[in-house]
Amino acid sequence: MRYRVLGRTGLRVSELALGTMTFGDDWDLPEDRPAKLLEQFAEAGGNVIDTSNEYGRGTAESTLGELLRDQRDAFVLTTKYTLQVRPGDVNAAGNHRKNLVVSLEDSLRRLRTDHIDMLWVHARDTLTPVAEVMRALDDQVRAGKVLYTGVSNWPAWEIAQANTLAEERGWTPFAAMQIHYNLLDRAAENEFLPMAHAFDLPAFVWGPLADGRLTGKYLRGEQGRLDKVAWGRARGDGDDVVREVVRIAEELGRPPAQVALAWLRSRPGTVIPVIGATTEEQLRQNLGSVDLELGRAHLADLDKATAVPAGYPHLFLRFPAMTRMIYGEHWQRVDDRRTTTRRAVTDDLFRTAE
């Protein structure tokens, strides 16, 4: 496994992260399974562990605390706060400072550590001002309890607002974002990935296999934990895309999951899939994606099968008439070789003129 530099930091992170939602009591894994999965991930070179104070009502963190007791510093340990963990307590949810402080202390205790390598804000709480979130996170960084901060499930414009505010006020900006992104849901390409490029934010991807659909198991009639509906998508939606993934996998002699993960790794910028597993065989297949590089023809086939419209204002701004009015009649003779402009991202990174 290779490593990526985490955004505008010097931290080195593996090209796959291990998701540990299944380590919680909700999943009822055999007692020795989490240890085996963690060892397998580490032996493959993985060093990023993704968990949350909400997974299994804290039991996923407790399990990790036990497993990492003698090897804590070998991993980049990340966890999250925001989601409700104490029903009945009106302040036991949200992005606000009180929930951050209480949740972080509980996570440190369960994980048996004195610091979190990266603390994610799990989802946007629109009641809490962005300034409160960023200042509260900065306080935890300055206290040494958190090394880096990340943001998950926020609108792209608010992530941009948050990092701009942090930079202007000398606070700690988000070092990474975590988003939902896969071959069945490419909506992130319109706003999130261009924004991430502008801010040097790596994208950690949850749901990279679309709740197992991109493994092809539902086409084979197998059952799964999200058998009927998952995150608003009916079971049969996207079957044509899954069939294309399966076709390419058969041509390559690889599992479909590896094709789906390799496609994510081929995306521009730093895209790091968060892989989870309930069995060692599942994890073995997912880890095997790191040595698969899809060729241009297969990438083109997948793009054709899954592309989403760019939408407004992107298509509008690229109409030839608008281009001439915005840039003048000499626009085709102007060379822009800068690498960090919004133009280079929004227009060129993902889209071709239609």
List the predicted regions and their residue ranges.
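Conserved, mostly hydrophobic/aromatic
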Residues: L6, L18, P34, I49, ...
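Aromatic-lined glycan-binding groove of carbohydrate-active enzymes
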Residues: A188-Q223, P255
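Terminal-tail/helix-coil boundary detector
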Residues: A198, G224-R247, E251, S266, ...
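Short, well-ordered coil/turn segments that N-cap beta-strands
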Residues: L11-L16, G45-N47, Q71-F75, T113-D117, ...
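Glycine/proline-rich, positively charged
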Residues: W27, E39, E43, P87-L184, ...
